[in-house]
């Protein structure tokens, strides 16, 4: 049995020697190294989804097959993980930008995240938290109001601007309108005192 294995190994070595090929494809490995270096530089700038990184590398004129291999390698090494990316993206965008569930879902979809991951990550957001964020944004916007609106058109102008701030962050029109009115009325009460 052992002699059979030795014979098979000798035959394999002779076939390899006869083929005059290298054990490694140096040109391919150099290309992979270039793509890997660029990928790591991009990931060093900020976290990215698999889709984003793949598109950036392909748009940099790298061979799509090599890009695919390098991206798979980064996923195996856990340097690229769509679920971790999504959770961190949602956390940061909610804290720093006050984005709604709807806006975050759209952003993650644009970044090529699978719908199951989006549902899981965005599903953790409670409706009460969403209202609190909208309320905070509305109160921040109306703080710039220095005097009470003198007439209905001026009130509508302030309302429109406040609703616009909330709408751009993806909050529903009904929620934005309700919270904007609440914030404006509270600010008017403060001004009157």
Swiss-Prot record:
Record organism: Corynebacterium diphtheriae (strain ATCC 700971 / NCTC 13129 / Biotype gravis)
Chain segments annotated as coiled-coil in the UniProt record: none
PANTHER family: REGULATORY PROTEIN RECX FAMILY PROTEIN
Keyword DNA-binding (UniProt): no
Functional description taken from the UniProt entry: Modulates RecA activity.
One Pfam match: RecX_HTH1
Domain of life: Bacteria
GO BP of this protein: regulation of DNA repair
Subcellular location: Cytoplasm
GO CC, any one term: cytoplasm
UniProt-listed InterPro entries: RecX_HTH_1st, RecX_HTH_2nd, RecX_HTH_3rd, Regulatory_RecX, WH-like_DNA-bd_sf
Name of this protein: Regulatory protein RecX
Protein family per UniProt: Belongs to the RecX family.
Main location: cytoplasm
Keywords noted in UniProt: Cytoplasm
Gene: recX
NCBIfam families membership: PRK00117.4-3 (NF001059)
